[in-house]
């Protein structure tokens, strides 16, 4: 009788309570398109590996504090993986602490596989003092999101308005290019 009661009580537990999920960000490609007014559109392409599931969404911390999410955010499975998910909308919710909640707009969430998350947001780099004139040079800064579990591959592409000289990276000993604690916290 005890075994029967235990089996009956297990049957009453919702199936989702049995689920487990692991996820890891495998790569990030961020493209920062800056206009002459100092406004930028940041395009994020995150490759995320998922085991188990379902994964209904996740939080990304360290996004620009003034970020304004743009429409048409999507997720799709990466070709050649176990998952076969068509292009699916994402719901983005920017929080005041610089966290971006990314929800998959799909009842079943995401199960084991590798997925590409594509989303964009606007930010004002000039207003946040992340574009600075230093003599005849102009310095552009951008701090990307933080990945608490680490990341295998990260790349940032800056697209800047044309100028008289091509962009360069600052010398390692120069005062230009130094990052202070405010920048490390998202601005």
Describe each model-derived feature in a short phrase:
Residues 14-187:
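Lumenal/extracellular ectodomains and adaptor appendage modules
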Residues 2-11:
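Bacterial N-terminal signal peptides
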């Amino acid at each position: 009788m005890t075994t029967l009661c235990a089996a009956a009580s297990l049957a009453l537990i919702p199936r989702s309570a049995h689920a487990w999920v692991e996820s890891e960000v495998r790569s990030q490609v961020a493209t920062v398109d800056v206009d002459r007014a100092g406004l930028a559109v940041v395009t994020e392409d995150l490759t995320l590996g998922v085991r188990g599931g379902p994964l209904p969404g996740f939080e990304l911390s360290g996004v620009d504090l003034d970020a304004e999410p743009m429409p048409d955010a999507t997720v799709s499975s990466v070709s050649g993986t176990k998952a076969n998910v068509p292009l699916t909308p994402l719901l983005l919710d920017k929080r005041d602490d610089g966290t971006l909640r990314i929800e998959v707009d799909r009842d079943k969430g995401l199960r084991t596989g590798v997925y590409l998350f594509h989303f964009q947001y606007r930010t004002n780099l000039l207003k946040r003092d992340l574009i600075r004139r230093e003599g005849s040079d102009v310095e552009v800064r951008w701090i990307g999101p933080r990945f608490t579990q680490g990341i295998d591959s990260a790349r940032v592409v800056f697209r800047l308005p044309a100028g008289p000289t091509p962009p360069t990276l600052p010398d390692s000993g120069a005062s230009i290019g130094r990052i202070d604690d405010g920048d490390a916290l998202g601005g």
